[in-house]
């Protein structure tokens, strides 16, 4: 069925929720001609801040990478003292750049807590 092959679709962008490796594998098996991109962007940002092009090899683990930062954004994993952790270390992801919101509109209390 030509409609099931999605002949006009060149890319599928997954964003908003984590894309599971299993779902990515199913997509790549069914639509190998359509590129698959895993995007990441927290609510505090105006849009996605990183992209990862998913291939069959990357779907073998328990999660998919979020990829590299988009232009004008920067990603770092920091510890409780806001210092960078070594590769593979445990910390929290910090996003900086032009896409990060400056606070909560007309709500200085929530902005201070953020």
Predicted regions and their residues:
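Short gly/Ser/Thr-rich phosphate-binding loop of adenylate-forming enzymes
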Residues: 1-5, 11-34, 43, 61, ...
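Non-catalytic, surface-exposed connector residues within folded enzymatic/regulatory domains
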Residues: 3-6, 48, 105
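AMP-dependent adenylate-forming
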Residues: 21, 29, 35-38, 52-114
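SF2 helicase/translocase ATPase core recognition
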Residues: 40-47
């Amino acid at each position: 069925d030509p409609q099931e092959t999605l002949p006009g679709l060149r890319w599928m962008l997954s964003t908003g929720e984590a894309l599971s490796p299993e779902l990515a594998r199913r997509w790549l098996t069914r639509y190998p001609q359509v590129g698959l991109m895993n995007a990441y962007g927290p609510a505090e940002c105006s849009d996605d801040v990183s992209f990862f092009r998913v291939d069959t090899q990357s779907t073998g683990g328990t999660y998919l990478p979020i990829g590299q930062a988009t232009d004008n954004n920067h990603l770092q994993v920091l510890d409780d003292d806001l210092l960078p952790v070594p590769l593979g270390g445990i910390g929290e992801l910090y996003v900086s750049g032009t896409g990060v919101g400056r606070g909560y509109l007309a709500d200085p209390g929530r902005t201070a807590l953020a």
